[in-house]
């Protein structure tokens, strides 16, 4: 049986800039564990200096890192928080009250995303629910999903009202770099599903995605930031389908003989 009711867990890799503020925001838990992927920027020392327990495990994928935490952290409940996120006093009070006598085995946590310095109120970045508060004995991450992790939960999940604060993309370059890291994975998913885009598909998908974010998800509420992010994500959709189409065309080219 776990000796503590709730611990916060932070996955890190070179997060010296964020780690201390993140750990401090979890001071209300029964302990904070930093699961570090062999940082070289002093993240581990800074985490210890702020009162966190530090464990090290070489990074394989996000799902595996979270499963390592579920296997090793001694607590009945785990709240996963990223280094660029902060728990608020309101979230602390809500979580503490709920987990003492709830039937749910997991809780979806909303996030307030700050992107390019702007608090997003729509455009798909709010409420941006994440399944982060987990009863450790009832949760496992799908190890086949290397990004965009999926939790296999034994039981029902509820929804919290109080958000995490997420200091998301600060610059356009940071945004572009992260989307590039996701691109190969997302293209692979489309290819595995047998998706065969037509010539026009990348462009119609881009238009649909922009409409979905800016109109359906009310991105207009975020004014110029909603328009910018809707455009960037629409461009990402276009490139994704262009990549799939390009790969299909390459596969269909007949081999030449000399």
Q: Where in the sequence are the language-model features?
A:
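Short, structured coil segments at secondary-structure junctions
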Residues: 28, 49-51, 129, 153
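A conserved acidic beta->alpha catalytic loop
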Residues: 25, 36-46, 82
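Short acidic donor-binding/metal-coordinating loop in glycosyltransferase active sites
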Residues: 37, 57-59, 75, 82-85, ...
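Catalytic-site signature of metal-activated, phosphate-bearing donor transferases
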Residues: 67-70, 77, 88-251, 257-258
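Conserved beta-strand segments of alpha/beta enzyme cores
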Residues: 31, 53, 156-158
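Acidic helix N-cap motif at the loop->helix transition within catalytic regions
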Residues: 17-20, 41-50, 90-91
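Glycine-rich, basic loop-to-helix element that forms the pyrophosphate-binding segment
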Residues: 58-73
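N-proximal low-complexity "stem/linker" segments adjacent to membrane-targeting elements
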Residues: 1-25, 253-254
């Amino acid at each position: 049986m776990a000796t503590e009711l709730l611990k916060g867990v932070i996955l890190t890799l070179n997060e010296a800039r964020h780690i201390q503020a993140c750990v401090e925001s979890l001071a209300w838990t029964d302990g904070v564990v930093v699961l570090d992927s062999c940082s070289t920027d002093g993240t581990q020392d800074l985490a210890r200096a702020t009162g966190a327990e530090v464990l090290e495990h070489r990074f394989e994928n996000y799902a595996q890192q979270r499963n390592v935490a579920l296997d090793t952290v001694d607590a009945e409940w785990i709240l996963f928080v990223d280094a660029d996120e902060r728990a608020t006093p309101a979230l602390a009070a809500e979580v503490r009250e709920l987990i003492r006598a709830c039937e749910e085995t997991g809780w979806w946590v909303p996030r307030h995303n700050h992107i390019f310095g702007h608090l997003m109120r729509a455009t798909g970045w709010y409420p941006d629910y994440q399944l982060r508060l987990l009863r450790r004995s009832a949760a496992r991450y799908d190890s086949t999903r290397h990004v965009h992790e999926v939790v296999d939960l034994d039981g029902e999940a509820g929804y919290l009202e109080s958000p995490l604060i997420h200091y998301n993309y600060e610059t356009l370059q940071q945004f572009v770099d992260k989307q590039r890291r996701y691109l190969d994975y997302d293209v692979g998913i489309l290819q595995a599903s047998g998706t065969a885009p037509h010539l026009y598909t990348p462009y119609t998908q881009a238009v649909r995605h922009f409409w979905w974010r800016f109109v359906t998800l009310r991105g207009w509420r975020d004014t110029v930031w909603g328009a910018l992010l809707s455009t960037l994500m629409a461009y990402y959709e276009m490139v994704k389908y262009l990549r799939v189409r390009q790969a299909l065309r390459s596969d269909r080219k007949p081999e030449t003989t000399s």
